[in-house]
Amino acid sequence: MTGLSAEQFAWLAAEVAVLVDWDAPTGRPRSLPLRTALVVVLFLLRHNLPEDAAGELFGCSTATIWRYQEELEPVIDVVLSVLAAQITAQAHRDGALVDGLVAPVGERDGVEHLYSGKKRYCGQNVQVVANLDGRVVDVGEPYPGSMYDSRAFEASGIAERWRAHYQPGGLGLTGDKGYQGTGIITPDKKQPGQARSDTAKEYNRSVSRIRAAVERAIAHLKNWKILKTGYRRALSDFPRVLRTVTKLEIYRAFG
């Protein structure tokens, strides 16, 4: 239901309880106990049900669901920040992979450049770094879905944070042909009017084999359905929600 094991959820709930005075003696009584409220928040990130449906399921109002999301998601982010930073630091000791996903967000009034011609829907371009085992280790700041991966790679902060990997003598950062020209390892580009050599073909096959791991990592990240089936909340909140989901996925995979 939450995307986490029972042990992982228990630890997270205990850490959140330290930071949140949930049952304060003053103020309005809570509709749900803290552990149940935390289940609700994780459930919505994992399954992306409408908030009114979640309210029906858990026996509280839609307004209460919204309030718990706004209150608990930042706390989850804080609790998991140290672990996420440690995992990212460890990942810098080996080769890495990068790819982009476009998280659907729908059309938004007054917001331009969300439409991805490649994906054929409106979304946010999210740059994802994975280790060679196919687990997410870093995610960049989101940008409009119309932005090419090569540009989003630079704009999102990923290029700078992983620059040492694709400098001479670096451990290597590999991407698909959408990253050609950025300096990272990419498939060989076929020149017009020239046949691709057997060596180039084998090189491209080896790059594809390596890149399969980042595709697995993105599939795991998109199991948090809020990044797959349509983000409906305020677009201004998307970067924060993305950071929280990224840390939850890192915790799920490494915790």
How does the language model describe each region?
Residues 1-27, 81:
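Charged, often Cys/His-bearing segments associated with DNA-binding zinc-finger transcription factors
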Residues 55-67, 73-74, 78-255:
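Short, well-ordered secondary-structure "scaffold" segments embedded in the functional core
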Residues 33-48:
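Short, amphipathic alpha-helical "recognition" segments used to contact nucleic acids or chromatin
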Residues 24-30, 231-235:
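Short, surface-exposed loop/turn segments at secondary-structure junctions
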Residues 21-23, 36, 200:
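Glycine/charged-rich beta-loop-alpha catalytic/anionic-binding loops adjacent to active sites
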Residues 52:
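Residues within the helices of the helix-turn-helix
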